[in-house]
């Protein structure tokens, strides 16, 4: 689902015009609310995320029975983002809470700062330590306002067919680094020539490249906003993808439907992706129960990170009314910063929690029959804690991504020189955005 919506998002966010000039929103102490507070708040979200908030609204109303929570469901993130741009630009019809994908928080908060409440004084003082570390950098704006609270995460793991590995005599524990992955992949395909060792789309979505960059503690921009798409670590990251193709280990699954089909039909032995994929295969491939397992992704070196981030969303308060702001914060706190609500949303809707205390709850750490009674959740929790805090985005992130997707396709499909192509991309981003290229 994430891959299907990425281009609509890029399109809609890219057409958001420059909005209000940056002015720090003066934060005042919010009025106290209790069970007698009577108001109504509107929350915008999409698909299963919207349905999850409808569920947490029910338990929220046990404490605040007179606060009505209206959750408006959009068909997808792209559709929602298009509407966000319209209402924020006009200043009319803005909801009290917006769901925003983590990488796109600054695309809205930087352009329309007066509508984004600074949550720093409301959130726990240790908020940066109790959520997915990869979500911290995307939750603040350039002035240091905490404009969003992390909701769900996409810790990246390697899904693999345990039955195929067993048939080929492959021990998955022998895969520690990317060099191991390539070596074992050749061995696997030598024994099972009709199955590719890995698959992913070579076109349209740069997600796998971004996964490897985050793992390698780099992104398109660094903390200072300088361009790092042509840095040695970015080059190293996409070089791995080219090697997998050049070594004949990779299947181009082209798009979302092709990816589902390849995994369902046994055309690939592994798939490296965010944890939301686990829910996808349970839904789309129930007949494969017991055949899949998950493990940490290969590292760039023996001491390197075996974790990354792919996807996930946040909640932001965009109301200007103090009572509605207070009610909105109470709802966000109830939904995102309590173990019970996060477990509810994960168990019922597959939204993997960004809230780290969930990982220590005994209800979370249970064996998963679909993955051969593996302690799957425990693995995902370990990976999330280890994700490098490498994701830095900006108000012009959509422009950067559009250029990145173009060069990603050129490198993987046209065999273009990697360093030269990324140098050109860095120059193009610099020309388009005025940003400096990191030295």
What do the predicted segments below correspond to?
Residues 86, 94-98, 125-164, 196, ...:
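A structural signal for short loop-to-beta-strand junctions that line the ligand-binding cleft
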Residues 35, 137, 295, 346-405, ...:
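Long, aromatic- and glycine/proline-rich binding clefts that accommodate carbohydrate-like moieties
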